[in-house]
């Protein structure tokens, strides 16, 4: 019998399972689909400290960036290449320089390496950048990883330590006895365990309800354009200053801002959009046009580059824009790890470590209280 069943084999569930198994916990991971086949597969692979205002999420991001080295070193050699690139990030403004420079100052005070540079220096870093740039901030700690490779490598590490990963298994409910979790009910039968981790991403609210611990997690749709392969033309993760505001916004309406990055395969990824429209997965042409228009405003050469495909996905959004990490006091033995919205790839290592520290009872490496399950925004307490 496993000690813990993790429900959800995306990058957050995989990171939790990997950290738990590294601490000696017997883990089984289940997913109704294929590992990394949901939200994780629709991610860009952002590992960012640059897009977060000072506060708990930035603290988690800084810790997670450091934790990546530890986690990657634990991966089995045959799956260790997850296309990790510590390429750095470049945030640019085309209007008044002061807001971006002021934002960078607050980040530096919070421990982020945020370097204000001149337009000329920005053009040195990115020769094809628009000459309309008025100021820029360089973030050497921003990085990129291939999300599906990362999640599957983390799950491979779990298997290597004796854990189990079961695809195509749908969790229905959590079984309890004498006020504690005793197992997970699935369509394939009951899996007995001492604890359950709800890592269902945008579906975590539904599973939380089924498990007896409802939480307010909503889907937020995002779309990405993918160009045809090109010679290296974008060297860093580049985005406009509006991206920071869009990331932190709770607005349900469509928001778009520009983030452009190349991949090892030579394609260029163009985002990003945010929209709360439930689980409507229809391709919205007007969203794609807006992404393309804004990307050309940052990199004019993209106007002549063909788009090979587009994809989108649903990100788990919490109303106060903070992840939910930790035990559910209403259901002893039920844990949650969700609500990271579009930052889950980058926040996964620290999330897995924090949940594991709380689970095994060692002092956590950062303050877990901002992410607790029983906060008003998550459980609806007024």
Model-derived features with residue positions:
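N-terminal Rossmann-like FAD-binding beta1-loop-alpha1 element of flavoenzymes
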Residues: 3-28
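Short hydrophobic core segments
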Residues: 5-7, 191-203, 207, 352
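Active-site substrate-recognition segment that forms the wall
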Residues: 18-19, 45-46, 80-85, 202-329
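Glycine-rich FAD pyrophosphate-binding loop
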Residues: 22-41
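Dinucleotide-binding Rossmann-like beta1-alpha1 core, especially the glycine-rich loop
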Residues: 45-125, 295-296
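Short beta-strand to alpha-helix junction loop
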Residues: 59, 91-99, 137-156, 282-287, ...
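Helical element adjacent to the flavin cofactor pocket in flavoenzyme catalytic cores
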Residues: 137-194
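C-terminal catalytic lobe of FAD-dependent flavoproteins
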Residues: 147, 280-282, 286-382
